[in-house]
């Protein structure tokens, strides 16, 4: 059977993409033996502000809960407050600072905190006594002795190698 070769004909219609969309398989990629179950009850932490507490610059017992040891305002993440509550607390703290109910910074705790942080990072520091003349004289005399001993050793080697 002979099949004749026909020349390649260009179609008059432009190339069309198929209208079929890509279908994802019905089965999930990985099957787990026990599916993940959400708890029935929503997990909600209680706010540190009670229903009767007024957020005011005079309410120092409430304000002190939201200030760190260094005297900084704690973040919302740590406080677990709503945005509105956090704003009110921040305003109250700033008012209390301006009216000198609160210090702007707690310097005593801050110094302790900085000293601890530095010692943890760098380790203990030892001071070098460089400017005491007696020590520098001792150091120089020791250096001179070392140099003279080394020169003697070198001379002895040279003499022994010449023989």
Curated annotation (Swiss-Prot):
InterPro entries hit by this protein: Ribosomal_bS18 (IPR001648), Ribosomal_bS18_CS (IPR018275), Ribosomal_bS18_sf (IPR036870)
Signal peptide: none
GO CC list: chloroplast; mitochondrial small ribosomal subunit
Localization in the cell: Plastid, Chloroplast
SUPFAM superfamilies, alphabetized: Ribosomal protein S18
Keywords: Chloroplast, Plastid, Ribonucleoprotein, Ribosomal protein, RNA-binding, rRNA-binding
GO biological process, one term: translation
Keyword Metal-binding on entry: no
One Pfam entry name: Ribosomal_S18
Region Disordered: start-end pairs: 1-52, 144-163
GO molecular function: small ribosomal subunit rRNA binding; structural constituent of ribosome
Compositionally biased spans, kind Basic residues: 7-48
Transmembrane residue ranges: none
The protein's assembly and partners: Part of the 30S ribosomal subunit.
Family as reported in the entry's similarity comment: Belongs to the bacterial ribosomal protein bS18 family.
Name assigned to this protein: Small ribosomal subunit protein bS18c
């Amino acid at each position: 059977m002979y099949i004749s070769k026909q020349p390649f004909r260009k179609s008059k219609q432009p190339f069309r993409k198929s209208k079929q969309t890509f279908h994802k398989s019905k089965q999930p990629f990985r099957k787990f033996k026990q599916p993940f179950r959400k708890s029935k009850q929503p997990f909600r932490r209680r706010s540190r502000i009670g229903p009767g507490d007024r957020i005011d610059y005079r309410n120092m017992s409430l304000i002190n809960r939201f200030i760190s040891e260094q005297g900084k305002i704690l973040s919302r993440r740590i406080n677990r407050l709503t945005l509105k509550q956090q704003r009110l607390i921040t305003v109250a703290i700033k008012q209390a600072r301006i009216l000198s109910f609160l210090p702007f910074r707690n310097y005593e705790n801050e110094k302790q905190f900085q000293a601890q942080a530095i010692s943890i990072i760098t380790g203990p520091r030892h001071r070098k006594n460089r400017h005491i003349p007696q020590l520098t004289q001792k150091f120089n005399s020791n250096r001179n002795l070392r140099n003279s001993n080394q020169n003697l050793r070198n001379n002895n080697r040279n003499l022994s190698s010449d023989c």
